[in-house]
């Protein structure tokens, strides 16, 4: 049995809860992406964690492949009226849970702390306020196996809600360039998990906190890729045309 322990079951201050869009509309999955992840792990059973899972279809599809999947979502709107409500009806409080991802939490499986082979979060990180990012990444590091992979995409364009009840809301609360992101990720205990067989295209950017020039960096029409392990397979959460940065990371040794 899987259970979640937290004092913050809902991200009540998040613009994505107050003025929901993705948490209600999104229930995206991608079989090519799942296949690429499975191939990377030699098609063995893996433990997968999806942060900002919305309707939970990605996790439902991993589970249907025989994997152990958990999805975490910040807003109850996904469960109550989202596009993936049927997944929440089936997997809610078993594989899908709500939690404020910017606060401490711990997942357990049969009362043992869970560790995951693969943690993924697409177009979610930029929704976390800058002052909460270190706690956000600390939870990921705590739940990642020592040889696990953390994969994310981060949008670099603004997304403003506007004025709601006298307060200006901004969905994308952390919009930085690749230099700031990679320095922050290294400072939070991650390093690139690149595939040496993937030919990089150097982008000529300096990363002061990184020892030497990062390897496995490529510039493509969709955006900048850092250590990306899955070739052309990208989870189709959003259509991106140079608007995102993609990272595949592992724990820093």
Cite the ranges covered by each PLM segment.
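Conserved N-terminal segment of class I S-adenosyl-L-methionine
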Residues: 1-114, 118-122, 132-137, 174, ...
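Short, glycine-/aromatic-enriched active-site segment of Class I SAM-dependent methyltransferases
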Residues: 152-173
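Short catalytic micro-motifs in class I SAM-dependent methyltransferases
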Residues: 123-127
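Short aromatic-enriched loop/helix-cap "lid" or pocket-rim segments at secondary-structure transitions
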Residues: 82-84, 161-166, 204-210
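A C-terminal cap/extension of S-adenosyl-L-methionine-dependent methyltransferases
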Residues: 151, 196-253
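Short alpha-helix
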Residues: 173-189
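A short glycine-rich, Lys/Arg-flanked "PGG" loop and its adjoining helix->strand segment in the class I
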Residues: 134-146
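Short N-terminal helix/helix-N-cap motif within the alpha/beta-hydrolase-1
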Residues: 129-133, 161-162
């Amino acid at each position: 049995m899987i259970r979640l322990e937290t004092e913050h079951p809902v991200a009540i201050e998040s613009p994505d809860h107050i003025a929901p869009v993705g948490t209600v509309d999104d229930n995206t999955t991608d079989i090519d992406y799942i296949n690429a992840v499975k191939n990377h792990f030699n098609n063995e059973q893996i433990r997968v964690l999806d942060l900002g899972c919305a309707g939970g279809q990605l996790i439902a599809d991993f589970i249907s492949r025989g994997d152990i999947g958990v999805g975490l979502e910040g807003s109850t709107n996904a469960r109550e009226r989202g596009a993936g409500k049927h997944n929440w009806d089936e997997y809610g409080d078993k594989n899908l849970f709500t939690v404020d991802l910017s606060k401490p939490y711990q997942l357990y499986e049969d009362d043992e702390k869970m560790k995951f082979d693969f943690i993924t979060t697409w177009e979610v990180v930029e929704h976390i306020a800058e002052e909460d990012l270190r706690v956000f990444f600390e939870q990921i590091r705590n739940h990642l196996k020592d040889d696990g992979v953390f994969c994310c995409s981060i949008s670099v364009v603004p997304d403003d809600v506007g004025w709601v009840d006298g307060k200006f809301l901004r969905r994308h609360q952390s919009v930085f360039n690749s230099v700031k992101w990679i320095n922050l990720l290294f400072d939070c205990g991650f390093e690139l998990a690149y595939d040496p067989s993937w030919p990089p295209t150097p982008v000529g950017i300096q990363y002061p906190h990184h020892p030497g020039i990062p390897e496995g960096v490529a510039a493509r029409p969709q955006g900048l890729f850092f250590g990306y392990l899955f070739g052309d397979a990208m989870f189709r959460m959003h259509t991106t045309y140079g608007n995102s940065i993609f990272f595949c990371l592992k724990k820093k040794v």
